[in-house]
């Protein structure tokens, strides 16, 4: 790979392009100030305005969410893995069909591997703008977001409708669902009952890794944060490691696998 090719695969923080209309809750008060970034792959954005920095997907997608204080991301579920690394700020993650099954607060450097198939949301509870990096499993990130019914209802009250084609339509700007395209069906009460309940006692020890614990495990070798034999034992189609000074040799090497470095 030449230098030109490599430069095309570098995304710098200062060049990130946010989308403020990425999801169905973009007009809902309390969620209307968040920013979505798609860095590698299109992720699960529902907006035609979303800028994708690197379109190639190596079996997973990488993005980010940026939010000011007291801004939240509404309850939703995914069909593949969703992992967050807190880049900046203080964040509360909550889960459950109504968001009240449990919660945990994460600080800078912490990692959370949210169990696939449960509803989750998160909010910035810090005092400044914060950002969390996200890794979504699969080339298509599982085919889109599954929203809790109340999120769809709240969005409709504020002019946004999600079509069954996965696209957003802003009725306050005169947009309508295209002919032959219906609204995204809401989950029924019976379907909602099929989602598992996970207590904080089950969640936190198995799906949260704290920064200083990760740093300690990176002494002399990369910390295996998410792997079959990692701190968070899982095989979601990618591995997550943390490197620090002395974790790896400075010798050149090659690998047959895709490798993404976040500095």
Regions found by a protein language model. Name each.
Residues 71, 79-80, 118-119, 128:
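A generic "binding-loop/recognition-motif" signal
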Residues 140-152, 158-175, 235:
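Intrinsically disordered, low-complexity, charge-dense segments enriched in Lys/Arg
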Residues 50-55, 72-78, 95, 103-104, ...:
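Short histidine-centered beta-strand/loop micro-motifs
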Residues 83-85, 113, 127-146:
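A short hydrophobic beta-strand segment most commonly corresponding to one strand
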Residues 1-58, 164-252:
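A short, N-terminal "cap"/entry segment at the start of jelly-roll beta-barrel domains
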Residues 72-74, 92, 111-112, 116-122:
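Histidine-centered metal-chelating micro-motifs
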Residues 59, 64-69, 77-97, 135-137, ...:
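Short, conserved beta-strand element in jelly-roll/cupin
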Residues 97-116:
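Short acidic-glycine-tyrosine-enriched beta hairpin
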């Amino acid at each position: 790979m030449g230098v030109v090719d490599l430069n095309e695969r570098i995304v710098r923080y200062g060049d990130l392009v946010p989308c403020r209309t990425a999801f169905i809750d973009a007009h809902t008060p309390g969620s209307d100030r968040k920013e979505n970034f798609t860095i590698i792959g299109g992720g699960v954005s529902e907006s035609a305005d979303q800028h994708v920095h690197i379109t190639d997907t190596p079996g997973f997608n990488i993005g980010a969410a940026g939010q000011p204080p007291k801004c939240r991301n509404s309850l939703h579920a995914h069909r593949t893995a969703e992992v967050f690394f807190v880049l900046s700020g203080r964040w509360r993650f909550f889960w459950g069909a109504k968001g009240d099954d449990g919660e945990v607060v994460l600080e800078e450097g912490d990692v959370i591997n949210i169990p696939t198939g449960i509803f989750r949301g998160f909010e910035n509870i810090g005092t400044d703008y914060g950002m969390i990096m996200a890794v979504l499993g699969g080339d298509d990130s599982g085919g889109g977001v599954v929203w809790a019914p109340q999120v769809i209802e709240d969005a409709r009250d504020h002019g946004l409708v999600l079509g069954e084609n996965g696209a957003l339509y802003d009725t306050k700007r005169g947009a309508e669902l295209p002919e032959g395209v219906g609204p995204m069906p809401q989950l029924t009460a019976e379907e909602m009952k099929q989602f598992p309940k996970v207590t904080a006692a089950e969640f936190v020890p198995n799906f949260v890794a704290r920064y200083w614990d990760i740093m300690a495990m990176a002494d002399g070798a990369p910390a295996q944060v998410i792997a079959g034999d990692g701190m968070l034992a899982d095989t979601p189609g990618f591995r997550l490691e943390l490197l620090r000074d002395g974790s790896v040799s400075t010798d050149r090497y090659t690998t047959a696998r895709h490798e993404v470095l976040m500095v």
